[in-house]
Amino acid sequence: MRLKTFTFVRWTFSLGTILVLLGAHADAAAISSLASRGYAVLPSPQKVTLGTNDFEFTNAWHLELGQGVKPDDIAVQSLKERLQQRLNLTLSKSTGSAGVVRLAVAGNAVTLGDVRNGNKAALADQAYSLQLTPDRVTITGNTPIGLFYGVQTLVQLLKPESGKLFLPAGEIQDWPDLELRVIYWDDAHHLDHLDVLKEALRNASFYKINAVSLKLEGHFQYEHAKPIVEPYALSPAELQELTDYGLKYHVQLIPYLDGPAHVAFILKHPEYAALREYPDSNYEFCSTNPDTYKLLQGMFDDLLAANKGGKYFVLSTDEPYYVGLANNDQCHEADRAKQLGSVGKMFAEFVTKTASYLHDQGRTVIFWGEYPMKPNDLNALPNYMVNGEVYGPEYDPVFKAQGIRQLLFTSTVGWKEYLFPNYYLLPEAEHLPGPAEGTYEPVHQGPGVVKEMSDFISQSPAWQNANLLGSFIAGWADVGLHPETMWLGYATGSAVAWHRDSPDPRGAMNAFYKLFYGPGGTNIGRMYQLMSEQGQFWKESWEVKATSARTPIWGDWNIIYETPRPSEDQTLPLMPVPSSPLLTLGYDWDVQNSRRLTMAGRFLAQNDELLDLIHTNLEQTKFERYNLELYLSIAQLFRQNLQMLLDLQHISAELKQAEAHAGRAEATEAVAALDRALTLAAGIRNQRNEVLQAATDTWYKSWFPRVAEANGRRFLDKVDDVKDHLPVRTVDMTYLIYRELLYPLDDWATKTVAARNEYAAAHHLAAKSFSLDWGTTGSSRD
């Protein structure tokens, strides 16, 4: 995924440079004129002129279609749909009613202001004007696309108040600063239902997002790569249906396929082992093997045939760590790199071969123009591609001179956020120490991801150094986040790409809360803050250790390990086991975990507040109830972790009680304390299983089941040899509690029962039969 290792360092450096040279937007930036009147619009329009008064909008108003507009146009359909669905309002069919909403298309109706980068004509196609008076609302688009966007703004503007709907008198003229606004939807490790994906496309259009890049990996029924197809996978007809649905709403559905790296989902299969760059690594294709291109071209054909009407294709050339290095019996890249002059030119050759095939099929290819290419390698690239990222002042002017346009790439969530994005950050004092790097590294202080994205997009030197086409907002699901958690970042990040000089990010966040959840929302910002902070503590509340739970890691971005190295997992300090003859404990578990336990108590109280807010908003908000149900399931996962920590503390207390009773020769009481400790352990298991089942039920309302076999197909359960994505560790939803399953509480329980029974026998007390079955995740048992 993007923004890792060298890429992440580069982005961080460039942002720091930006902040120094240009100055970040202050948190106290002036509120927009619309927000000051209680109106929420996202993205914020370019030009707003408001009168002094608001006026009422009712179902007595009627619709009038002007030049260039037909009754079946999507702008007309969308206006009717959204008025009915969001506001329970149907416009009058009587043309004699007092108010009129007039829709029209007129070329050059809106003249763009300062265009700082990009294709002015393409930007003008998306422009619209909105004139608002007490008896007439007129939306005029330069094209049908602009008209559609004007409709979305009108619907967003309608403000419920005291049982009525209001609009501000005035005029809006609006257009985008960047032509293409892509969000990345990650279905690599799960598959959303088709209706969920359709709704995602429609939601995207509401925020003027005009492209969704969908990563499916094995969740598509490839004709030319049948072994990789997973138990649940979109059919070609379904992908075409999804494509057509997006185009209806002026949203491009962009296929996303990795290569040469990040292809363990292909190369793990024995049928494709001969295509590996290194025989013992499934991470990367051999770029000199003709069969690599034959396979990729077949997969391209399958995707293109099911994506007719699409314009773009994301050829994800992400993190090709080892390209040009291999020299073994099945791959001779090193020789070719030497012939070409560098591994960067070797990479450029792979990009050119694959992209030219797609270009010949009529697609504009978005790729990642990055390491190991250097500026003097870029002249080997054709100019018909789009670089999906900016790469800094050393590279961007070279891409520009080469005629290669670029996207401003950033992420609403990366590879270190578990269960929920870092929209808000914990204060420094609330963090627990952790590793200095890697996925379990504690969160660094900062303004939160929305402001980080806003600063990067609005203040990037690429506005001067590159020929910008658009933005790319990624929502990575490497660690298994649900895409529903990413909408705040998708909408606010893309809003800055539409209007670079948008008001401050906090204002955009508040506008999103109003628009996404509708009227009746209570302290939504606080709910997101608590979700973010609880997610950070969920990750940091466990320690990190080397693991044998999966095969070792073959290499990293800058090295091939001579001997593969263990990956990492999370754990907690082990519970002490009583020893004979007096149930002696070797150490004080509470002391080892003092700060962890203190903070768990505080976060449990905050979890109470979070659950109250989610339940309140489930009762009161009008829209996105499933989103809130999902947040409830995540909040319960947070809570289960907190309660487990505190229950382990209670177990520790019972062990101490047993030791104390044994020291006073109170055998009956000592055994009873041990029995209570074992009962607490069983309670942790039961609660964990109940929360997992509830989360699974909720997530499967929008996902197909993660299973080993279905529809005559089997999932090949093998991990990536270089990357360690948490959902790949399990076939099912148990990745949500994976670290708990690895925690050796079963071993502790077995040894504690043995110690208990040995002590009981010595004091003529009954033995106890007990099996914790810690790894069992089925129905809870008494």
Where are these regions (language model features)?
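Bacterial N-terminal signal peptides that target proteins for export
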Residues: R2-F13
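Contiguous, structured surface segment used for ligand recognition
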Residues: A29-L178
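Beta-rich nucleic-acid/ligand-interaction surfaces
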Residues: A98, R102, F220-V229, M373-D377
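Sec/Tat signal peptide C-region and signal peptidase I cleavage site
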Residues: A24-A28
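Substrate-binding groove of N-acetylhexosamine-processing glycoside hydrolases
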Residues: A35, V41-S44, T49-G51, N59, ...
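Short, internal active-site loops enriched in acidic
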Residues: G107-A109, P260-A261, D318-Y322, Y371-K374, ...
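Substrate-binding cleft of carbohydrate-active enzyme catalytic domains
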Residues: D177-F367, G388, V398
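Bacterial N-terminal signal peptides
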Residues: W11-L22
